[in-house]
Amino acid sequence: LLQVPLEKGQSAREYLQEQGLWEQYRLKYPYNPMAKFDPSFAVAGEPMTNDADLAYYG
């Protein structure tokens, strides 16, 4: 078992907001996590995480 330390960084949303590009990005790439999967494989009713808000890496 290996322990990997986590580091907190800026989320993609924070970075784009800082650059003033978040609204432009959000309009160009609307949040739709199921767009990349075949709908016949849908088995869950829970939405997937929004990767734009991830801030911990390790």
Curated annotation (Swiss-Prot):
Propeptide: 1-41
Membrane-spanning parts: none
UniProt keyword Disulfide bond, yes or no: no
Top EC class for this record: hydrolase
GO BP, one annotated term: proteolysis
Keywords on record: Aspartyl protease, Hydrolase, Protease, Zymogen
EC number annotated for this UniProt entry: 3.4.23.-
Gene3D superfamilies: 6.10.140.60
Keyword Hydrolase: yes
GO molecular function list: aspartic-type endopeptidase activity
Record-linked Pfam families: A1_Propeptide (PF07966)
Family: Belongs to the peptidase A1 family.
Protein name: Pepsin-1
Organism: Thunnus orientalis
Lineage: Eukaryota, Metazoa, Chordata, Craniata, Vertebrata
